[in-house]
């Protein structure tokens, strides 16, 4: 994930040109994973949520704990990252304090991930120590089927609360409820994306509500089931431009295999 300032500049450029060159022709680096319209929540309400951080404790991406030592996130969060410089904070409502911070012993991302199309945007991290479940730390299950369009889900994270002009991240975990849009519907004329939506993706939409920069890699969940991974989108909470997520059911086999072999 690019640094927040760099990402904001890229997103601003993307927004400025989207109207003239068309959504499908925009540079993929201008549409990184993007909580707008959300509200403060607690880690106890979403105990699977984790924060990926650098050595200084700066949050750069979200993730989901799926077992005692495995975190699922987006591939683009891990590209170029050195294991020794990545840490995971678990069990805290605040990204900058509380809970526990665990080092990472290994990480990988899908070999078929494309930074151009954002297909197969999934990766995992293996923690350096096993983490037991508590009231504030829980493993989340992987969905086996994509929920029908219109199903309500929740996306959480510490990402920017607005698009472009918010220069700091909220310290308190944010949550927003959105409605699932299957990939075929998301690629249809009903929305503005068209051919840039693929079968390893799922969308989620609610007017003036969305994930935003800093939320990348975080969970789109229904109950205790992970259905999506925050991946990308044009701007944040834009009209007829849903947030785009990696579809967990479509990528479940890869996640399980990587978790067992890494």
Curated annotation (Swiss-Prot):
Record bears the keyword Transit peptide: no
Disulphide bond pairs: 61-77, 186-203, 212-236
Signal peptide from the UniProt entry: 1-19
Catalytic activity: Preferential cleavage: Arg-|-Xaa, Lys-|-Xaa
GO biological process, one term: proteolysis
Subcellular location: Secreted, Extracellular space
Protein origin, superkingdom: Eukaryota
Keyword Hydrolase: yes
Active site (catalytic residues): 76, 121, 216
Gene Ontology, cellular component aspect: extracellular region
Predominant cellular place of this UniProt entry's protein: secreted
Peptidase S1 domain span: 35-260
GO MF annotations in UniProt: serine-type endopeptidase activity
EC identifiers of the protein: 3.4.21.4
Main EC class the enzyme belongs to: hydrolase
Site (Required for specificity): 210
Regions crossing the membrane: none
Keywords linked to the UniProt accession: Disulfide bond, Hydrolase, Protease, Secreted, Serine protease, Signal, Zymogen
Propeptide: 20-34
Protein family per UniProt: Belongs to the peptidase S1 family.
Protein name (database record): Trypsin theta
Gene: thetaTry
